[in-house]
Structure formats: C-alpha cells, structure tokens
Amino acid sequence: MNNVEGTETTAKKKPSLKDEVFDWMLEIVTAVVILLLIFTFALRTVDVYGNSMLPTLHHGEKLLLNRFLYTPEYGDIVVLTKPCKGDEPLIKRIIATENQTVDIDFQKGIVYVDGVALEENYILEPTTRSFDVTFPCVVPEGCVFVLGDNRNNSKDSRDSTVGMVDERYILGEVVFRITPFEKMGKIGW
C-alpha cells in the first residue's frame, strides 16, 4: 500500500537509437533545405576576375551578393550579366539610375550626374578614358549606368557593348567580402 490513491508513477521512456537518428537526420535535412532556399533566392557567391574594381575589390576575392528584394541605388556595387558577355558576370558600381543624366568631362576626369560632380573617393584614378558612348546621356527607364572603380581599366557603360544595363540583368548587390580572410567584412563606402 505504498501507492497513494490518485498518484501515478510514470517513467519517461528513453527514445530508441532509431528515433534519435531519425530526429538528427530530419534536422540536418531541414537545415540543408533552408540553406538551399537562401542561396537560391536570397544570396549568392561570386569571385572577382580582373582589376576593373581596384582599389575597392581585387582579383581572386570571393564576395557574397544579396539578391532578395534589391532596388538599385547610386553607389551600390553590383554583379550583372549582359547577353553580349556570355555567362561571365561583371562587377561594377552604379553611378546613375533611370531618368538621370550622366556626363563625363574626360579632360578633367570628372563624372557628373544631373549636373552635379560626383565625389568619388573610391576610384583608383580620375576618368580619362572614353569609349563609344556619347555624353551627356540619359539613363533609360528600368536601367542603370555603371562604371568600374578602376576607370581607365574597365569596360562599363561608357562602352556600347555594355551600355545602359537593364535592371533585370543585375544578379545582386555585393554586401560582404568572404575572402581573403584578413579583409573579410561588409562592403561599403
């Protein structure tokens, strides 16, 4: 009569090894699916090829892009594709967005947007190299005007083979430098 009426003794059942393995596998599969969804729809990695973005980005660096709900703005560093360039992505800085007027004084190396000279402390040297695009030019609706930070060693919107970039060709905004590890961190200006 050690049992008091109304109380029950319940022993917790230890989960079997099979149940524990199943729980672990379910958590791993869930984590992998979540990571795949994030890297499919929100983030992407890309490598820097070439020197057109010096001094900001260097050849061989690995970058992380934000692809989720992105709206292009002046100063953003973006990765884009162009039908004429095949699958090779280009990394450039947005200088102007739709309906803005871009003018470049190649003698003085100054870029103007809507008549205002840009303060460009991020460029390697002033813009003295011209291509076949005539200035001033107005950025069409749904497009952006991009330049490399290494202005005199960059194929960008000054060249008609790149030209004004339709926003649909922007893969995403560069938000983070992954490698080299000593320079790892947020990309900003």
Model-derived regions: residue spans:
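Structural motif
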Residues: E61, E73-D76, Q100-T101, K108-I110, C143, Y169, ...
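Short gly/ser/thr-rich secondary-structure transition/capping motifs
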Residues: P126-S130
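Short strand-turn-strand beta-turns centered on an Asx-Gly dipeptide
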Residues: Y112-G115
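Protein maturation boundaries and topogenic segments
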Residues: M1-P89, V165-W189
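Beta-strand-rich cores of mature extracytoplasmic or soluble domains
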Residues: V133, C137-W189
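RNA pseudouridine synthases
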Residues: K92-D103
